[in-house]
């Protein structure tokens, strides 16, 4: 359109109109374009929010972006971490304490819009409590956790809505709630599948038990736990060269461990066990 249509507009000396496509990496790479990887490298502005290690988060583009949001609103506008001016505290989860940014990272899928939502919820909670800045107690509260879990579930519903209708998505959500375990093995998952009261309907729409598990993985609902310490998430493993990364059935054993995303716990009742 830019070359065939807009380039023919008269009086272009008054300004130039161009259309810029904004899209997700997975959608672009699955659009059937030739040399899609080269188009991203040579003809695109690729916004990559991925990171390798949580402990190195101060060096990531995602942290710099979020931190700059605070710096822009700060009167000092210094290079010093503005994040710490508002969230310079540890957040407890179970028996562990987390740096606030790492805690937020684990609630998200490393997307800026997730952080915007988290900050909006924190602001609303501060206003409700008549305090200026957030506290660890606000972030740890059931109100905060439930509000973000609802947002996460609605985002998932929207993404699934491109492929399934409302009743089909509800059936999938019912199955997730039926699991009732935040951490589970492949064997436990298979047992849940066998006992699910709508198994036949679920299988007719979404495929067999592995295909449903693969769907949960591809939509960042679950991760594979390796060596009890490394969490293999789809959004972290997916790259331009490996954009179709997914579960491999032959790699799974009955003892393969999975974990649901933190943000699913409240909405799907997975925090119960």
What would you call each of these model-derived segments?
Residues 1-92:
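The catalytic "switch" region of P-loop NTPases
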Residues 95-273:
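C-terminal leucine-rich, beta-strand-based interaction scaffolds used for sensing/assembly
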